């Protein structure tokens, strides 16, 4: 585990974004942990989050020309990542996002910011079913651009209805890498090393055994 990954997990726990207990997911599964990126909801938290995303961008080695934040949750994530890449990694890159509803007046269209062109790195919080990413892939295709990859905060490493996870299905269907700041593997490693949180390790390990990929 990289230092920034350990720091991110601690940051997510401190902000109440990553919690342990018993949670019912949309899928109906009862999960021993829950991740809610919407709680990175202050200026300082968003700035710090952008730095973690930027570190993961650099670590991934994915070559790209523009950052894309899918509406709505991806918008602040892409902007914070762009700021952090410029300020901390000397990489001043264009970024853009889409509107849910296209505008007929003003600048018009459904895209805001930089032109969506070349190789595109998609920034989002999580991939649950993969539906949103499939919509984004169509937006990129419509602009004659190319998806270079997807970066998310947490990979739950959890299969869907079939044998693959939603992330694996996206990688298979579109031939692009999906990378994350952390995955469940690193969360398990963090729990094992933390005396206060170690009590949650058996439940998370059991969940991984049942639903993991």
UniProtKB/Swiss-Prot annotation:
One of its GO terms (cellular component) is cytoplasm. GO terms for molecular function: magnesium ion binding; orotate phosphoribosyltransferase activity. The keyword Protease does not apply. Orotate binds at residues 34-35, 128, 156. It holds the Pfam family Pribosyltran. Its EC number is 2.4.2.10. It catalyses: orotidine 5'-phosphate + diphosphate = orotate + 5-phospho-alpha-D-ribose 1-diphosphate. Pathway: Pyrimidine metabolism; UMP biosynthesis via de novo pathway; UMP from orotate: step 1/2. It comes from the Bacteria. Keywords: Glycosyltransferase, Magnesium, Pyrimidine biosynthesis, Transferase. GO terms for biological process: 'de novo' pyrimidine nucleobase biosynthetic process; 'de novo' UMP biosynthetic process; pyrimidine ribonucleoside biosynthetic process. Its cofactor is Mg(2+). 5-phospho-alpha-D-ribose 1-diphosphate binds at residues 26, 72-73, 99-100, 103, 105, 124-132. Catalyzes the transfer of a ribosyl phosphate group from 5-phosphoribose 1-diphosphate to orotate, leading to the formation of orotidine monophosphate (OMP). Homodimer. Belongs to the purine/pyrimidine phosphoribosyltransferase family. PyrE subfamily. This is Orotate phosphoribosyltransferase.
